[in-house]
């Protein structure tokens, strides 16, 4: 998600920049890594392509915005981590204003495709 630093304007606005609207954070991130790699003398081309692939495939599926599906184990692991991170952030947001002792159902969430509530575990 390194490309988000260029995709979005500074806080508190967090609006999309022109570059963000046109290219998106995935492409911007791959370009940023490519530019940095070019400054490292002797950096292996194969590894550079593998790193850029991981960035391009980190959303995991074409319908989620990735221009490529993961074709490397590392890219697949990164896409899983990105997916779990997004889902856990959604849960955190759901429970932000819910008291810790509230174990009532919070309603259906489209991203999680589930009705959600806190567990009773302490």
Predicted segment positions?
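Divalent metal-dependent catalytic cores for phosphoryl transfer on phosphate-bearing substrates
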Residues: 1-98
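N-terminal intrinsically disordered, cationic/polar leader segments
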Residues: 79, 96-98, 103-113, 117-122
């Amino acid at each position: 998600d390194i490309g988000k630093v260029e995709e979005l304007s500074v806080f508190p606005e967090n609006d999309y920049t022109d570059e963000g609207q046109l290219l998106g954070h995935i492409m911007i991130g791959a370009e940023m890594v490519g530019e940095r790699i070019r400054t490292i003398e002797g950096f292996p081309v194969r590894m550079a392509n593998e790193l850029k692939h991981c960035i391009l495939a980190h959303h995991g599926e074409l319908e989620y915005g990735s221009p490529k599906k993961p074709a490397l184990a590392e890219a697949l692991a990164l896409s899983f981590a990105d997916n779990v991170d997004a889902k856990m952030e959604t849960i955190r947001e759901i429970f932000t204003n819910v008291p810790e002792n509230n174990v009532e159902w919070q309603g259906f969430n489209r991203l999680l495709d589930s009705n959600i509530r806190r567990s009773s575990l302490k």
